[in-house]
């Protein structure tokens, strides 16, 4: 969920809001490809890098935003229609900043979809269930109420291509 939140934050981020990922739909089959490329270093020498990366990636991300209550100084900016409109315009234009899928060499594209497309889009995993076990879910950053930085790992299951990120009723570990 943290990586998907990074994609959404690249499209529109303000300290007034916190983007929350609800679910992701994995449209294409999960496939990998390996390849090598020559990297040019800052001292103008070159090296060979070998990479294994996901290929043919297509995710549909369902999310919402909430007010950042850790910033009471921004209460005057809590206008739901304003932020919804800016987010929608940003998504329709492909986001505000480049989206990276892991590292800078893997740039992603963003486009706006509506609820109808999210629910009707077929996936390679329709009718199947895959248990991924425990996976990294998100970070809990220190704030006024919590003093420690925590990593959250949750038991992740994909049902018909959809992974839900709501932790209610889901087994998770805090580290």
Question: What residue ranges belong to the model's regions?
Answer:
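Long, hydrophobic N-terminal alpha-helical segment
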Residues: 1-41
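Internal, well-folded beta-alpha domain core
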Residues: 37-175
